[in-house]
Amino acid sequence: VSPERLALAGEFGASRALDARDGDTAARLREGGALDCAFEAAGSQASLDAALASLRKGGELVLVSLMGEVRLDAFDLVNRELRLLGSVGYRDAYPELIALLADGRLDLARAVTRSVPLEQAVEHGFEALLRDKSQVKVLVNPNPALADA
């Protein structure tokens, strides 16, 4: 997690943005009480474990990252009556967010730290995200000429 991403989370309204490398993330998330809902967006086993451990009984975990195989304690899920939901961001999954964007009440332009044409997506897009942790989101534009129109 980069300082830029943590700061941006606060700018977008997160009440807390934590760096998982700074100690017991689950305990820090539970300060003031366990969570009703957690979103796992980092794509690591450690962040998944922290998100699950931060939930109250009956809480919900939404997985929005892609991470391949993970370990889950099925007994814990059942015993604590947790709900697990996977989401890949289809248009009708976020109607409130889309309305905020359409009305101009939410500007996500600050999250886009780089824009690259499609033919440079790997070298200047994905590899930049891996090398430069200050990058937040890279926009891959299949037709840059339309962006200038």
Where are each of the predicted segments found?
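Adenosine-nucleotide cofactor-binding segment
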Residues: 1-50
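Residues in the short beta-alpha loop(s) of Rossmann-like NAD(P)-binding domains
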Residues: 1-2, 67, 90, 143
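Glycine- and other small-residue-rich loops at beta-strand/loop junctions that grip anionic moieties
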Residues: 18, 36-41, 64-66, 86-87, ...
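Short glycine-rich anion-binding loops that position phosphate/pyrophosphate groups of nucleotides
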Residues: 44-45, 67-68, 145-146
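C-terminal hydrophobic helical "lid"/dimerization subdomain
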Residues: 49, 91, 96-149
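Helix-to-beta-strand junctions that scaffold the AdoMet/dcAdoMet cofactor pocket
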Residues: 55-57
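Short glycine-centered segments of the SAM/dcSAM-binding site in methyltransferase folds
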Residues: 59-60, 83
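Rossmann-fold NAD(P)-binding glycine/threonine-rich loop
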Residues: 65-82, 92-99
